[in-house]
Amino acid sequence: MTSIVFMGTPQFSVPILEALVANDYQILAVVTQPDRKVGRKQVLQQTPVKEAAVRLDLPVFQPEKLSGSPELADVIALQPDLIVTAAYGQFLPTKLLEAAKIAAINVHGSLLPKYRGGAPIQYAVLNGDSEIGITIMHMAKKMDAGDMIEQASIPIEATDDTGSLFDKLSYVGRDLLLKTLPGIIAQTAPRTPQDEVQVTFAYNITKEQEQLDINQPAEQLLNQIRALRPQPGAWLAVNGQRTKIWQATVAETTTDQAAGVVVALNKKDFELAAGNGTVLKITEIQPAGKAKMPVQSYLNGVGKQLAVGQQVVVQDAE
């Protein structure tokens, strides 16, 4: 039986771990991020991978920082045949990668060499890509730079956002890993070096990237909204108030109004002029300090003071 140390953190990783157990791979340990306090009540929450590991009765390690930790030595001492990572969230020390008797493998959420880094799915949506995929790859000291074993792709639908693609890709990754593992174990699987000329990066989303720039075309704004959903959410400064935009469409109409001006307003419509004469039609919104709401509820409450022709969006508000 092939022994594995599995490393992962979010829900994306859970179907992969469950499949390894179901297919009789020996999971020596699961390494995941520490429990974190979340929400206003600061409730201590386990990672989805820890919850799955506990349910599957697997040993769990949760170092705050893996490098130099006592847990690192414990994991290395397990001498696994394979290390399998899927969205773990920390760099792996070289001596850990070298501890795998056969290979250290990563399930990466992009079609490498495109989108190395921690936010490949977000960037694929942000950039309006037509497809996304999974790469099964060997791990290397350099971030996401190892040789590729196999890839699988799926289309990005207009209705997709980062959340839906995370869900879809977790199963694509699961199936592709199960398909490639026999060849990896037999050491007959292909190894294709990445073309460094084609490399792009998808670093973690910054706070600055959460703000929508109303001077951008509506299609780009919509991509940003989808890329930042379900969290952390994209926002506009509406009358100086940070207002999250959760659902929107690109209106069929165009306008000669300046970006940030209200161009349509009634019980069901809240349309803003965006860049290049385009119009963003907002359908779900979250004013500061409030819950998400349909735009109808917003216009009956907080948004009552808005008027057609009014410049309501100001950049760089806090």
From Swiss-Prot:
Q: Could you say which residues bind (6S)-5,6,7,8-tetrahydrofolate here?
A: 110-113
One function term, GO molecular function aspect? methionyl-tRNA formyltransferase activity
**Class of enzymatic activity (EC top level):** transferase
Q: Which domain of life is it from?
A: Bacteria
Q: Where are the transmembrane segments?
A: none
Its UniProt entry gives the catalysed reaction(s) as: L-methionyl-tRNA(fMet) + (6R)-10-formyltetrahydrofolate = N-formyl-L-methionyl-tRNA(fMet) + (6S)-5,6,7,8-tetrahydrofolate + H(+)
Keyword Transferase assigned to the entry: answer is yes
- Gene Ontology cellular-component terms listed: cytosol
Which InterPro entries does its entry note?
A: Fmt, Formyl_trans_C, Formyl_trans_C_sf, Formyl_transf_N, Formyl_transf_N_sf, Formyl_transferase-like_C_sf, Met-tRNA-FMT_C, Met-tRNA-FMT_N
Q: Could you tell me what this protein does?
A: Attaches a formyl group to the free amino group of methionyl-tRNA(fMet). The formyl group appears to play a dual role in the initiator identity of N-formylmethionyl-tRNA by promoting its recognition by IF2 and preventing the misappropriation of this tRNA by the elongation apparatus.
Q: Which family does it belong to?
A: Belongs to the Fmt family.
Q: What is this protein called?
A: Methionyl-tRNA formyltransferase
Say which species the protein is native to: Latilactobacillus sakei subsp. sakei (strain 23K)
